Amino acid sequence: ALPYSKNIASPKAASEMVKLAMDHFAGIDIVINCAAILRDGLVFKGSPEDWDAVVKNNLSSAYYLTNAATPVMRDQFKETRGDGNNYTWGRIINIGSTAGLYGNFGQANYGSAKAGLFGLTRITAMEMVRSQVTANYVAPFAHSRVTDMIEPANQEQAQYKDRAMRVSPHHVANLVTYLCSDQANDVTGQVFGVRGREVFIFSQPRPVATVASIDANWTPEKLGEAVNVTLRSHFTDLATDLEAFNTDPIV
C-alpha cells in the first residue's frame, strides 16, 4: 500500500495519485471513491462556500479520480493485461449515502453531492461496460470519521448517530470486497446499502405510472385532474433517511 496525503478534490491531485499507482504497481484494478466531508446547513441558511466545499470533496473528487483512472483501465482491457487471456477485471466503487437517495434536513449540499454520485456511477457503468469494468454505488451505515462529524440538532439525529457509532465498518468492507471479486463480474450500475449485517439493493428511478391524452388541446386543468386520479397514489413521501432507517441495525 502507498499513502497519498493530498486533498484529491482537484484534477491535478487525482492525476498524481493515478501516476503514483502506475509507477509502483504498473496498473490500476480497483478505484474506490470514499472522500467525504460534512458542512450541514439548511438550504435557506447554508453558505455558498460550504456548498462548494462539500460538492467538491464528495462529488467532484470522485469524478476527477474516475476521469484519471478510467483511460488506464480501458487500455488494460485492450492490452489484455494479466495472464494473457482477455482482461475482464476492473472495479469502481463509489461510496454514497442514503442522504443522497432519500434526503435529510440540513444536508442540501451533502445530499445533492451524493445524489450526483449516483448519476456518476450509472453513467460510468454504461460507458465502461465495453471494457468490462463495473461501477457500483454503496450507501453505508457505520461508524466513520464522517459520523464523528455529525452534531445532532435533535433527538432523532442523536439516536441515528448513536446507532451508527455501534456499527463496525468491516460490514461495509465485506460488501465492497464482494463487489471487487470475480463473483461480481456482471454486477454493475447497482445501488447497494449496507447496515451492519444487513445488505440491500435499492430500486432506481423508473416510471411507475403514466397519463396521456389524445386531445391536442390538453389544458393544465385537465392534466391536473389526470394527475390526481392516476399519478397521485404513486407519489413518493418526504421521509428522510433517518426516518426510513430508525430501527437498531443487526450488528
Regions found by a protein language model. Name each.
Residues S5-E16, P48:
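The beta1-alpha1 cofactor-binding region of Rossmann-like NAD(H)/NADP(H)-dependent oxidoreductases
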Residues L20-N33, R39, T134:
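A glycine-rich helix->loop->beta "capping" turn
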Residues A26, Y102, A115-F118, I123-T134, ...:
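Active-site-adjacent segment of SDR/Rossmann-fold oxidoreductases
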Residues L42-V43, S47-V55, W89:
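Substrate-binding pocket helix/loop in short-chain dehydrogenase/reductase
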Residues T66-N67, R122:
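A short, exposed helix-loop element centered on a Lys and neighboring polar residues
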Residues S97:
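Residue(s) in the substrate-gating loop at a strand-loop-helix junction
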Residues A158-V251:
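C-terminal helical subdomain
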